């Protein structure tokens, strides 16, 4: 079987542009321009310092390869049993619509690093990222175990 674990439900470039939608128009334009080049398979050499974390030269080959895929199209092609475990209800629904026979579950209060976090506040979320004492969410493990054992 295949398990989609907090996977994107739409292309990565759409997600990046959405995440930066609150930035000034010039930044949004730059991001779209960089994304357009990467989607075309072309690396970008003049990345502004403020966007280096996202688009530094060492990560561009990865982004180029990732941008080739639409998760909805990929998951629709799968023929084996599929389990969709999701944090974002929006992405879960997109993936579920692509493969209605898939088993899917929203994991309440789990963030994208698979830890329990009851807050959507970014500072609270980030505190869980670096805390090695926080375990992986228990519901996640139980759901995966049931899927694998069937």
Which residues does each PLM region occupy?
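Accessory cap/linker subdomain of secreted extracellular hydrolases
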Residues: 1-74
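Alpha/beta-hydrolase-fold catalytic nucleophile elbow
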Residues: 3-6, 85, 108
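Solvent-exposed, polar/charged alpha-helical surfaces in well-ordered, non-transmembrane soluble domains
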Residues: 73-76, 93, 97, 138, ...
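Short beta-strand/loop motif that positions the catalytic acidic residue
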Residues: 78, 84-86
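Residue-level detector of structured alpha->beta connecting loops
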Residues: 79, 99-100
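Conserved alpha/beta-hydrolase "acid-adjacent" motif
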Residues: 87-93, 115
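Acidic beta-to-alpha connecting loop that harbors the catalytic carboxylate
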Residues: 89, 108-111
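Catalytic active-site module of serine/aspartate enzymes centered on a nucleophile-bearing elbow/loop
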Residues: 103, 110-150
